[in-house]
A protein has these predicted regions:
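Short, hydrophobic beta-strand segments that form beta-sheet elements in well-ordered domains
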Residues: 40-49, 114-117
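Active-site-proximal specificity loops/subdomain of glycosyltransferases
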Residues: 47-88
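Conserved donor-nucleotide/metal-binding helix-loop-beta segment in metal-dependent transferases, i.e.
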Residues: 97-128
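Generic structural signal for small/hydrophobic residues in well-ordered secondary structure
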Residues: 44, 95-96, 137, 159
Length: 253
């Protein structure tokens, strides 16, 4: 499939960029703005119970019920996201992931109902994929309304693993792993030509030291999982990022 020309931002007139959050509001807005700098979308939505501050140019905020837990987030993504999406597809992002390279966009991404970074820790062929930076069709969003919610299983695992056979029986198509690796990376080593990424442990690769430190200092105290804090501490120590290392030590205390 033909990809966008180098240096050009693709016009994704059939894609809504959307973030759903109750935490890390400033970082989430930054992720939306970073994505908007690399691609043009039909609409850009921030769905949150908190009114945003700062630069919201081109972003529409819609108030939703508070998202206080991962279960709240999963329930919203499965049951209510479809109410806000008017385009055939939605690009779902979180605070720790965004579009890296608009030239890496491939129209073939739109041939599928779900595409996200492959998970390396599964070996059964159902490794696609991560929901934190994922492209989903409206058809998938509507189908998800009928899926049973099984806390504490996360919504992307419900969609892509637990109930994937049920969705495929309805004609839902999951992207092949080779295409998903070009779409995004998370826990698999990047090849350098991905459209986007997800993960706090990857965010630091794409920010200056001062920018990353500001983002992490602004996060709510319990935002990062303990393993993420250890991972970021090790990364910072190996690269001499003293400020970030001290921030992770503070969060581990």
């Amino acid at each position: 499939m033909k990809q966008a020309a180098p240096g050009l931002t693709p016009r994704l007139s059939n894609v809504t960029l959307v973030a759903v959050t109750g935490v890390a509001l400033a970082a989430t807005i930054e992720a939306l703005l970073a994505s908007m700098a690399k691609a043009q979308f039909a609409a850009v939505l921030l769905l949150s119970d908190q009114p945003p501050r700062g630069d919201m140019t081109g972003i529409e905020w819609r108030r939703i019920q508070p998202i206080k837990t991962r279960e709240d987030y999963s329930r919203f993504m499965l049951r209510e996201l479809a109410d806000h999406i008017a385009t055939p597809h939605a690009l779902c992002v979180q605070w720790d992931g965004y579009v890296l390279d608009g030239a890496a966009w491939d129209p073939a991404f739109l041939d599928y109902d779900y595409i996200g970074a492959p998970w390396p820790h599964f070996s059964d062929g159902h490794r696609v994929g991560n929901g934190g930076f994922s492209l989903r069709s409206r058809r998938l969003l509507e189908a998800c309304r009928q899926l049973p919610i099984e806390p504490p299983i996360l919504e992307d695992v419900i969609i892509c693993r637990r109930l994937r056979p049920q969705l495929e029986q309805q004609g839902i198509r999951f992207a092949p792993e080779a295409l998903a690796r070009r779409f995004s990376y998370e826990r698999i080593r990047p090849e350098g030509n991905e459209f986007g990424f997800h993960g706090a442990f990857n965010l630091v690769r794409h920010m200056s030291a001062s920018h990353a430190l500001r983002v992490f200092r602004d996060l709510e105290p319990k935002m990062l999982a303990r393993n993420e804090r250890w991972e970021l501490l090790g990364w910072a120590v190996r690269r001499g990022r003293i400020g970030l290392a001290l921030e992770m030590i503070r969060r581990l205390a």
